[in-house]
Amino acid sequence: MTNTLDVLKARASVKEYDTNAPISKEELTELLDLATKAPSAWNLQHWHFTVFHSDESKAELLPVAYNQKQIVESSAVVAILGDLKANENGEEVYAELASQGYITDEIKQTLLGQINGAYQSEQFARDSAFLNASLAAMQLMIAAKAKGYDTCAIGGFNKEQFQKQFDISERYVPVMLISIGKAVKPAHQSNRLPLSKVSTWL
C-alpha cells in the first residue's frame, strides 16, 4: 500500500492483534525514523519515543495502561513523549544550518532568542510539547499503515505511574501510547461527522 490517499483512507484503530505477527527491531526503527520526519515548530523536534518491544516490557506496561489487552497482544507499543525543554534542541538544530550556510549566525542568534523567549512560559512549553509530539504520533501511524501494520492511539493510561515506573525524566510529558501490529481481523471504519459540521468557510 503505497498511495498516500489510500493509506489515509485505510487507516483505522485496531485493538485486536495477531499475537504471532512480530515486528523486527529494524522495521520498528524504520517507522520511528519516518515519524521523526514530521513537522515541528522551529524544527525543535519536540518528541521522544519509549519503545516497548519485548514481551517482558509490554507485560510491565500492561497494568499502567489499565490492563488493555492490546498492550500485550500487539507486536510493540511506542510511548510518545513531548519535550518540555525542546528549546534546548535549538542550538544543535541551528548550528548545523549555520555551518552549512543556510542561515547566518545573526539569524541563528535571533531565532534562538525568539525560541528561548517563548519558552519562558510553562504553558507554552507544555502546549508545544503536546502539539508537536502529536504530529510525530500521527506520522508514525500513517507510516505503519503504509508498511502493512495497524495501530491504535491510546490515551487511557496512568501518566503519573508511567513516569515513575519507567523512570521518565521530568523533561518529558507522556502524550499517548501507540500499539503496533497486524490486525487479527479487518478493522471497521468508524463514522465521521459531516464535513459541513466540522468546517467553516470564510
Curated annotation (Swiss-Prot):
Its EC number is 1.-.-.-. Transmembrane segments: none annotated. It is an enzyme of class 1 (oxidoreductase). Induction: Repressed by YodB. Strongly induced by stress due to exposure to catechol and less strongly induced after diamide or 2-methylhydroquinone (2-MHQ) stress. Not induced by oxidative stress due to hydrogen peroxide or methylglyoxal. Its main location: cytoplasm. The keyword Signal does not apply. The keyword NAD applies. FMN binds at R11, A12, S13, Q68, K69, Q70, G155, G156, R192. GO terms for cellular component: cytoplasm. Its cofactor is FMN. InterPro entries: Nitroreductase (IPR029479), Nitroreductase-like (IPR000415). It is found in: Cytoplasm. Disulfide bonds: none annotated. Keywords: Aromatic hydrocarbons catabolism, Cytoplasm, Detoxification, Flavoprotein, FMN, NAD, NADP, Oxidoreductase. Belongs to the nitroreductase family. This is Putative NAD(P)H nitroreductase YodC. The gene is yodC.
